Amino acid sequence: MRRKIVVGNWKMNKTVAESTELASAVVAALGSDCSACEAGIAPTYPALDSVGRTIKGSEVLLVAQNCHYEDDGAFTGEVSTGMLNALGCSYVIIGHSERRQYFGETDATVNLRIKKVLAAGMKAILCVGETLEERESGAFEAVVSTQVTGGLQGVVDISDIVIAYEPVWAIGTGRTASSEQAQEVHKIIRNKVAELYGAPAADAVRIQYGGSVKPSNAAELFAMPDIDGGLIGGAALKAEDFAAIVKAAC
């Protein structure tokens, strides 16, 4: 039985003070109810230290939204895995659709980041997903399979990798893939992992759904056989909503 994982991606929201307050509210709202699954929050870089201190001692994990694939150097505006590790991050989100869309990340640069995260002793959340055009043209299976293959190129052991399926057309739009649509793609992803790493690895890998998950639809989505939790955007900015989603996974 795969242990479900729910991560709140706060994106570019909340000041440090607001982030600290929200983190405290999340811990309080969850109480000890998330022990059956993993729950994490991904604040902005400036808030990582403060949020990390706030959630210390709780079961809530600290997650980073991105990283660079070099250890250090002349890379203005970037943050290394060593810096994130020192702050206590357990996971790093890699290849989010917004990073691919707005900042030109490719499967190749995603792959470099995945390897760097694993080498630093953290776990990676590999994001994959199709656009509306790719969905409507029927290319979504090929697109997602290519992203999985490219992101994991040269990665021998995927035990520290979570895959997040995020239909780009359902992120921040209020639209949600039906539970059946989401399950279909999650199964495609699991089959691709089986092709690359074998059935035992495919059975063990956790695949999150990330596309406008809300308290009202979380339980139905998480009941699907190949959906192992969620990567939560907007709903993660309200402690009670996020806690309700986590509890739906537990």
Curated annotation (Swiss-Prot):
EC class name:
isomerase
Q: Which domain of life is it from?
A: Bacteria
Q: Gene3D superfamilies under this entry? A: Aldolase class I (3.20.20.70)
Q: Which InterPro entries match?
A: Aldolase_TIM, TIM_sf, TrioseP_Isoase_bac/euk, Triosephosphate_isomerase, Triosephosphate_isomerase_AS
Per the record's keyword annotation, is Metal-binding included, yes or no?
Answer: no
Where does it reside?
Cytoplasm
Pfam families xref list: TIM
- Biological process, per Gene Ontology: gluconeogenesis; glyceraldehyde-3-phosphate biosynthetic process; glycerol catabolic process; glycolytic process
- Catalytic reaction(s) noted: D-glyceraldehyde 3-phosphate = dihydroxyacetone phosphate
Please tell me whether the keyword Aminoacyl-tRNA synthetase is annotated for this protein.
no
Q: Which NCBIfam families match?
A: tim (TIGR00419)
The protein here is known as: Triosephosphate isomerase
* Source organism of the structure: Chlorobium phaeovibrioides (strain DSM 265 / 1930)
State the gene name recorded for this protein. tpiA
